[in-house]
């Protein structure tokens, strides 16, 4: 099965990032083949704490938090891409909630 990296730039998404991570966790694509890379632009809210809590509670999903030093979406995407290890890259926004089969459909479409 093909490895997929989901890259997510974010900034101050404490109210939405858990919903996104839960939706990624519940994807029909096998969790063992998904890596999530979140590029945080030095959030001033609890975004990092929410991500850390999700990581502790869901060790079966590889979630990595990296710094977006320039605090811009392009910089965040580049930082996430640098940390990504998947053969396929899927980009999501931190405030999105993808359908359960979103990753599977992306992979099948390639």
Question: Residue spans of the language-model regions?
Answer:
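Cell-envelope/extracellular polymer assembly enzymes that use nucleotide-activated donors
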Residues: 3-5, 35
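A conserved acidic beta->alpha catalytic loop
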Residues: 40-49, 70, 96
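Short, acidic, metal-binding catalytic loop of nucleotide-sugar glycosyltransferases
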Residues: 22-33
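Acidic helix N-cap motif at the loop->helix transition within catalytic regions
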Residues: 15-18, 45-54, 101
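Acidic donor-binding/catalytic loop of UDP-sugar-dependent glycosyltransferases
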Residues: 46, 96-108
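Short beta-strand/loop segment that forms part of the nucleotide-sugar
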Residues: 33-42, 64-68
